Amino acid sequence: MGYFITFEGIEGCGKTTQIKRAAQSLREAGHRVVVTREPGGCPIADDIRAILLDAGNSAMVPTTELLLYAAARAQHVAEVIAPALAEGAVVLCDRFTDSTLVYQGFGRNLDRDLIARLNTLAAGQIRPDLTILLDCPVAVGLARAAARINSRQTNREERFERESLLFHERVREGFLSLAGGEPHRFAVIDGNDGVEATATAVADVLLNRVPRR
């Protein structure tokens, strides 16, 4: 069986950059690494992702959003994550069930027990062995996210970047609450410490937690 690592955090926390660095480090150590993301990771889930993140879909109600995430995850787990783990790979996933619990539960105030049941329905027995939470102040993360959008030279915003500051504060608090409840699974890393310092901290966690080849 492989090893499943998820990366979590607010918008603009630096997950994408750190996942790339982590994948390189693990491959150099001899691991077979699969990098994926949610929502998305396979064609059907990518189609759902486009609907979920499109800022034009502002009329989407929270329950619709939740069910779309669950549908995307069910396909992603069946098509990508479960097979890779069965083959012994280290799977790095940009967001997983914790994001749904935090964004739709803490952020949207949907029933968290219901979300947990849907997460179980979608993911089955797949659970992260390690979750790296990159934490940074909301203002910092949103500024980074805005810069990322500007760098694309497009006016297209993603739906979550249009949410209120209070929404994003609830999301951050939600992640920290989950981490506090499962300290054995979560490694909380300062995502406001610069790319290199953050990468070093992530590498230290991986060295201590991922089984060696």
UniProtKB/Swiss-Prot annotation:
Organism: Geobacter sulfurreducens (strain ATCC 51573 / DSM 12127 / PCA)
CDD domains in the record: TMPK
Binding annotation for ATP: 9-16
Keywords on record: ATP-binding, Kinase, Nucleotide biosynthesis, Nucleotide-binding, Transferase
Protein name: Thymidylate kinase
Enzyme Commission number(s): 2.7.4.9
Class of enzymatic activity (EC top level): transferase
Function recorded in the entry: Phosphorylation of dTMP to form dTDP in both de novo and salvage pathways of dTTP synthesis.
InterPro entries, sorted: P-loop_NTPase, Thymidylate_kin-like_dom, Thymidylate_kin_CS, Thymidylate_kinase
One GO-annotated biological process of the protein: dTDP biosynthetic process
Protein family per UniProt: Belongs to the thymidylate kinase family.
Alphabetical list of Pfam families matching this protein: Thymidylate_kin (PF02223)
